[in-house]
């Protein structure tokens, strides 16, 4: 612990952002990260606690507290404070293959469990993580390091999202010959097309993927396994296969008029916009435009927020975000104590931009769509929305959100984006490999393991645990890699945490 009194001497300081009305003019990353001096002050605030919940990744009250990757936060904070940036990078990279991603898109579970934040403000862990990895790139610490010995074993990974990339990175370090198959035209999966460029600049992904290529990992893009290439062909070429295909089956909305023109799933909307941005700087017209339209987003999560920010940048006339659940409290409730994940109101970048542009928060709580209304040409023109309330189901004993009779209202809308979450993996991949699915339509395995019912076929990421965070996908990829390595070699020294 470099400075025992640091948490008393320095206040919390975190990355700033470009002003909302300025940043909506483009799709560039808008965070202004801390200087090294401020990063070192934040590192000095780290208390090196007796029980550092920041790195615990424990499940408390059904939710994760601390980092699922068990990042050695107190250790590398101390190294940052003392100016030993290379060693800080080594400690960070020991548990996290992709800090350049998590330092930009992770909700910072570590900070919510920080002891310093129990009575005061937490350490700016995510900003320091960003500082460590960017310093590593600037000084050559994050250079390619190909394995010195190859095992002769071959592994195919289906999907290049965070779990697939993590598994590939780990297995390649072990010396196995790894090939990653990606159906899209670029590597990255969710990172590339599911997260907008202003949140994660795609050059950051390309930078890391290029290093992985130099380290010997092979990438096959534009190949949809299960359609373009059959599993039987992969079985002949590879000793093991890991399915990292994500949970891309979107949850739909059942309401009259659902077939109206102008209703899209959020993931398709975001994907098309990013593709057009990267291919032509949005000049090819191959995207759904919100320009001049009243936009309604169904869903209050991160994807819904990304849609808010994207629609505003496209020039939407208005943006409304519907959330089924009640508005969370601004502070922790008595039954939600630290170090549990705080169930409190969060105003994200998209909502901040809506407030700046339209003068009000775009969210309407305890509300859903009752009916979509079309014009004579079948185009969406407005919605009927209805308020919801929590009621106990007498049969099950569970509380459910149900419509409030007589609360219907009309809302103008020419574009609706459904961001209601995902139901599980796409069925054609599972059918092609013959893997079993569980009740949640995720690929089934024994608890705590990654082997499927099909010999030599493993699974990791969202198509295993369900829709989740990037940090969880990385952890799944690392754990699956270790299990695959052990099955190939009889033992494994790949670290998981």
Go through the PLM ranges and name each one.
Residues 12-34, 42-45, 365, 373, ...:
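C-terminal catalytic lobe of FAD-dependent flavoproteins
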Residues 151-154, 222, 291-294, 366, ...:
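Phosphate-coordination loops involved in phosphoryl transfer and adenosine-cofactor binding
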Residues 5-32, 41-44, 57, 70-82, ...:
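Beta1-alpha1 glycine-rich phosphate/pyrophosphate-binding loop at the start
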Residues 259-292, 392-467:
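FAD-site-proximal beta/loop scaffold in flavoenzymes
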Residues 159-162, 299-301, 462:
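Glycine-rich Rossmann-fold phosphate-binding loop(s) that bind the pyrophosphate
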Residues 87, 149, 154-158, 206-255, ...:
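Feature captures the FAD/FMN-dependent oxidoreductase FAD-binding
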């Amino acid at each position: 612990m470099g400075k025992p009194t640091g948490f008393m001497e320095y206040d919390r300081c975190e990355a700033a952002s470009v002003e909302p009305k300025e940043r909506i003019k483009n799709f560039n990353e808008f965070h202004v990260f801390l200087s090294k001096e401020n990063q070192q002050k934040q590192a000095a605030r780290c208390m090196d606690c007796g029980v550092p919940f920041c790195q615990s990744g424990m499940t408390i009250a059904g939710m994760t507290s601390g980092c699922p990757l068990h990042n050695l936060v107190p250790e590398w904070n101390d190294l940052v404070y003392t100016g030993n940036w290379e060693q800080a990078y080594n400690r960070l990279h020991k548990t996290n293959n992709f800090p350049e991603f998590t330092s930009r898109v992770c909700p910072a579970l570590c900070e919510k469990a920080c002891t310093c934040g129990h009575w005061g403000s937490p350490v700016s862990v995510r900003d320091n993580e960003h500082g460590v990895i960017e310093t590593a790139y600037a000084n050559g610490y994050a250079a390619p390091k190909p394995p010195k010995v190859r095992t002769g074993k071959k592994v195919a990974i289906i999907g290049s999202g965070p779990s697939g990339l993590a598994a590939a990175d780990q297995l390649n370090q072990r010396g196995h010959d790894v090939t990653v198959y990606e159906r899209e035209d670029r590597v990255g999966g969710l990172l590339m097309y599911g997260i907008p460029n202003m949140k994660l600049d795609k050059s950051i992904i390309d930078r890391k993927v290029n290093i992985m290529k130099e380290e010997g990992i092979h990438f096959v893009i534009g190949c949809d396994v299960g359609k373009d290439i059959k599993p039987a062909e992969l079985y002949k070429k590879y000793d093991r296969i890991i399915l990292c295909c994500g949970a891309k089956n979107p949850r739909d909305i059942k309401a009259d008029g659902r077939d109206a023109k102008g209703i899209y799933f959020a993931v398709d909307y975001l994907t098309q916009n990013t593709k057009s941005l990267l291919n032509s700087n949005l000049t090819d017209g191959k995207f759904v435009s919100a320009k001049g339209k009243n936009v309604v987003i169904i869903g209050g999560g991160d994807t819904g927020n990304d849609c808010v920010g994207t629609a505003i940048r496209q020039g939407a006339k208005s943006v409304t975000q519907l959330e089924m659940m009640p508005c969370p409290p601004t502070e922790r409730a008595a039954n939600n104590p630290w170090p549990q994940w705080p169930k409190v109101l969060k105003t994200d970048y998209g909502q901040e931009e809506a407030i700046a542009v339209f003068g009000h928060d775009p969210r309407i709580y305890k509300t859903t769509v009752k009916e979509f209304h079309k014009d004579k040409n079948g185009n969406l023109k407005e919605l009927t929305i209805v308020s919801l309330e929590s009621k106990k189901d007498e049969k099950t004993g569970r509380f459910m959100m149900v419509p409030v009779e007589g609360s219907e209202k009309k809302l103008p809308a020419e574009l609706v984006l459904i961001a209601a979450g995902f139901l599980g993996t796409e069925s054609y991949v599972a059918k092609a490999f013959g893997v079993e699915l569980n009740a949640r339509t995720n690929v089934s395995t024994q608890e705590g393991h990654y082997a499927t019912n099909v010999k030599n076929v493993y699974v990791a990421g969202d198509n295993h645990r369900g829709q989740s965070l990037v940090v969880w996908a990385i952890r799944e990829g690392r754990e699956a890699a270790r299990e695959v390595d052990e099955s190939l070699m009889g033992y494994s020294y790949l670290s998981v945490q």
